[in-house]
Amino acid sequence: METIARYRYIRSSAQKIRLVANMIRKKEVVKAINILNYVNKKAALLVKKTLESAIANAEHNFGLNIDKLRVVKIFVDCGPSIKRVMPRAKGRSDRIVKRTSHLTIVVSD
C-alpha cells in the first residue's frame, strides 16, 4: 500500500532539496531517517519532516508496519517564484528571484 506525503511551497530551491532527496531514494525509512539526522543541511530537516509525515500516514491510515516501509519515490518539483526588484546605481535595477519547490515522498511496504 503506497502512502503519500507532500510539502508544498518550500522556500528553498529544488536543486538544493534534490541533493538531500537523492541520498534516501529507495532506502528503508529507518535508514533514511538515520541518514537525514547526520546531513548538515537545511533541506535535510525539510525532507525528514515530510518523511515522518509519510510514515505517520502509513501507520495511522493503513496500519502498516514501520519496519517494512521503504521510500519508493521521492521527487522535488519547482514551485512558483517570488520576484523582487533591487535598485542599483544610475537608475538601473536587478531582479531577485526567490524560488520555491514542492516535495513529494511515497512510502510503501
From Swiss-Prot:
GO terms for cellular component: cytosolic large ribosomal subunit. The keyword Ribosomal protein applies. SUPFAM superfamilies: Ribosomal protein L22. One of its GO terms (molecular function) is structural constituent of ribosome. InterPro entries: Ribosomal_uL22 (IPR001063), Ribosomal_uL22_bac/chlpt-type (IPR005727), Ribosomal_uL22_bac/org-type (IPR047867), Ribosomal_uL22_CS (IPR018260), Ribosomal_uL22_sf (IPR036394). One of its GO terms (biological process) is translation. Keywords: Ribonucleoprotein, Ribosomal protein, RNA-binding, rRNA-binding. CDD domains: Ribosomal_L22. Part of the 50S ribosomal subunit. Belongs to the universal ribosomal protein uL22 family. This protein binds specifically to 23S rRNA; its binding is stimulated by other ribosomal proteins, e.g. L4, L17, and L20. It is important during the early stages of 50S assembly. It makes multiple contacts with different domains of the 23S rRNA in the assembled 50S subunit and ribosome. HAMAP family: Ribosomal_uL22_B (MF_01331_B). This is Large ribosomal subunit protein uL22. The lineage of its organism: Bacteria, Pseudomonadati, Pseudomonadota, Gammaproteobacteria, Enterobacterales. The gene is rplV.
